[in-house]
């Protein structure tokens, strides 16, 4: 992973325009996201929050504009960016036919990790005792925590998370917020969407980028 101790800006957007089904979601959108930032993309449903996250993650192309990682166009540093990026979409990305432990093992190994204790990691997300349970038999909250468990064993600098608090109880949300603060304090950044109010991350620590629904 990239050593960014001497680098401040991690992810940048320059004049991004996104059009879906002939409707402009946002245009000429520019911003910098720095090491230590926790950034919430906010706005009503249909405003383009998920589309923006996917563009920042390099999973979708904007109609116009550029995205940068460490001041280099992500299309020219794709491998380096992918190594330093953790993207979790609003769908859990958990295979129902695998156990919680097998899902975590798969997700960590596919991300290049080979030295970890799945039971200890699952315990951190309150899944101790559910290691061998099929994901398809878990509750919605347990399903989501299975997906989020990889955050507790991850050294990517850029976390892009679409609705990470979905189906998570208040205690779980607070634990995630603490993890986000720790990650940012260690030189990473967190970019997320959520419809929930955060209790631990206060406004003086949270940056917000607002997208508004456009009718034309």
Curated annotation (Swiss-Prot):
GO terms assigned for molecular function: ABC-type heme transporter activity; ATP binding; ATP hydrolysis activity
Catalytic activity: heme b(in) + ATP + H2O = heme b(out) + ADP + phosphate + H(+)
Places the protein is found: Cell inner membrane
Keyword Nucleotide-binding recorded: yes
Domain of life: Bacteria
Gene Ontology biological-process annotations: cytochrome complex assembly
Pfam families according to UniProt: ABC_tran
Keywords: ATP-binding, Cell inner membrane, Cell membrane, Cytochrome c-type biogenesis, Membrane, Nucleotide-binding, Translocase, Transport
SMART domains xref list: AAA
Entry-linked SUPFAM superfamilies: P-loop containing nucleoside triphosphate hydrolases
Residues given in the record as ATP binding sites: 43-50
Domain (ABC transporter): residue spans on this chain: 11-216
Main location: membrane
Assigned GO CC terms: plasma membrane
Membrane topology: Peripheral membrane protein
The EC number(s) this enzyme carries: 7.6.2.5
Cross-referenced NCBIfam families: ccmA (TIGR01189), PRK13538.1 (NF010061)
Family per record: Belongs to the ABC transporter superfamily. CcmA exporter (TC 3.A.1.107) family.
Stated role: Part of the ABC transporter complex CcmAB involved in the biogenesis of c-type cytochromes; once thought to export heme, this seems not to be the case, but its exact role is uncertain. Responsible for energy coupling to the transport system.
Subunit and partners: The complex is composed of two ATP-binding proteins (CcmA) and two transmembrane proteins (CcmB).
Matching PANTHER family: ABC TRANSPORTER I FAMILY MEMBER 1
Protein's name according to its UniProt entry: Cytochrome c biogenesis ATP-binding export protein CcmA
Gene that produces this protein: ccmA
């Amino acid at each position: 992973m990239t050593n960014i101790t001497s680098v401040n800006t991690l992810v940048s957007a320059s004049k991004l325009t996104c059009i879906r089904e002939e409707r402009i979601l946002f245009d000429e959108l520019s911003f910098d996201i720095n090491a230590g930032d926790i950034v919430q993309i906010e706005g009503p449903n249909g405003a383009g929050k998920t589309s923006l996250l996917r563009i920042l993650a390099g999973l979708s192309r904007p109609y116009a504009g550029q995205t940068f990682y460490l001041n280099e166009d992500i299309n020219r540093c794709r491998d380096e960016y992918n190594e330093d990026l953790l993207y979790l979409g609003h769908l859990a990305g958990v295979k129902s036919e695998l156990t919680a432990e097998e899902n975590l093992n798969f997700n960590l190994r596919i991300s290049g990790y080979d030295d970890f204790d799945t039971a200890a990691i699952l315990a951190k997300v309150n899944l101790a005792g559910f290691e061998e349970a099929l994901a398809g038999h878990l509750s919605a909250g347990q399903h989501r925590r299975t997906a989020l468990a990889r955050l507790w064993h991850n050294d990517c600098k850029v976390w892009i998370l679409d609705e990470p608090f979905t189906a998570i109880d208040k205690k779980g949300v607070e634990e995630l917020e603490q993890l986000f603060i720790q990650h940012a304090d260690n030189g990473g950044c967190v970019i997320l969407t959520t419809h929930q109010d955060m209790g631990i991350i206060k406004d003086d620590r949270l940056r917000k980028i607002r997208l508004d629904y456009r009718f034309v």
